[in-house]
Amino acid sequence: MTGQRATPQPTLDDLPLRDDLRGKSPYGAPQLAVPVRLNTNENPHPPSRALVDDVVRSVARAAADLHRYPDRDAVQLRSDLARYLTAQTGVQLGVENLWAANGSNEILQQLLQAFGGPGRSAIGFVPSYSMHPIISDGTRTEWLQAARADDFSLDVDAAVAAVTERTPDVVFVASPNNPSGQSVSLSGLRRLLDAAPGIVIVDEAYGEFSSQPSAVQLVGEYPTKLVVTRTMSKAFAFAGGRLGYLIATPAVIEAMLLVRLPYHLSSVTQAAARAALRHADDTLGSVAALIAERERVSTALTGMGFRVIPSDANFVLFGEFTDAPASWQRYLDAGVLIRDVGIPGYLRATTGLAEENDAFLRASAQLAATELAPVNVGAIANAAEPRAAGRDRVLGAP
């Protein structure tokens, strides 16, 4: 203010922050205005005109009641989700099996509020989705981790051994895994469920792209252990709508009611998500095209000399670069934003539209000539331990 001495703005160090949060890095993927954005695994196909019109009409109807709180339990939305999943998985589901929230990260947070917390632990198999440890930290759940195999796939024997030895209260399994893209078979999941003493969360954010059956098929076999989480941010092209959900036995839904904030899901979000579900067949029609593009990109990268990790999602992890952060910058200089997920020698690229993928491949061809390291399979094991986060390097998110 005029006439007064300026008071220095406090820093984070000046605040009475919890000690266990000091020194932590927040999640952050760059949001940059570049010609080609392939860094956050969104569906590049925009919503259809019919879907947009439906959302506008639905939100307009909801807006007439904005002076009232929304449906606290989102019953109609959960019923729509149950119908969609019943058709997709072949498993008969009802509203009592579904819970919804603002993105799958809020779902994961609620699960750890209910089944994690002080004195409890959660384990994940790295490299994997970076929000699993971040949400664990935020809920005071001790984070444990075990390494994946040298090719970044889940070594089920090693995973079972780690769960048996460390007896975590919560086990995270991403299938398909982010950032490597591999899915876990139902037989592998059964072995983990048999070994786990507590809850197993199968994170199926990219489930619509997977060639493996959904873990939803196992909910009836493991009603006190299995929770499957999903999102509408990826295949459903609804990232801006922020809608995540889980599938589980009704008792798990009752647990969510104990920890959710009242009226957590706005009437606008519920209306827009229900409209998106009405157009599921049209929107998900892009999945086959994206899988075909993913395979085209993978084949082209392999032909250039890159090591491409076989993917079951809408992205590919590829390398091996002599200096991945420097290569990430060179892609950006070429107008292509991809992701440095913190694995030494590797970068991740979302599958975009054909013309976006062509631009990415042109940049890749230029980099392949000068920036690839000699393949050293033995060194890949070290990639399971992420380097320190910096710029965009938060392991595997989103």
UniProtKB/Swiss-Prot annotation:
Q: Which residues carry this modification: N6-(pyridoxal phosphate)lysine?
A: K234
GO BP term (any one): L-histidine biosynthetic process
Complex formation: Homodimer.
Per its UniProt record, what Pfam families does this chain match?
Aminotran_1_2
Q: Which SUPFAM superfamilies match?
A: PLP-dependent transferases
Family recorded in the similarity comment: Belongs to the class-II pyridoxal-phosphate-dependent aminotransferase family. Histidinol-phosphate aminotransferase subfamily.
**Which gene holds the coding sequence for this protein?**
hisC
Quote the biased-composition stretches of kind Polar residues, using this chain's numbering: 1-10
What is the protein name given in its UniProt record?
Histidinol-phosphate aminotransferase
Q: Which cofactor does it need?
A: pyridoxal 5'-phosphate
Give the reaction(s) catalysed. Answer: L-histidinol phosphate + 2-oxoglutarate = 3-(imidazol-4-yl)-2-oxopropyl phosphate + L-glutamate
Pathway info: Amino-acid biosynthesis; L-histidine biosynthesis; L-histidine from 5-phospho-alpha-D-ribose 1-diphosphate: step 7/9
- This entry's Enzyme Commission designation comes to 2.6.1.9
HAMAP family linked to this entry = HisC_aminotrans_2
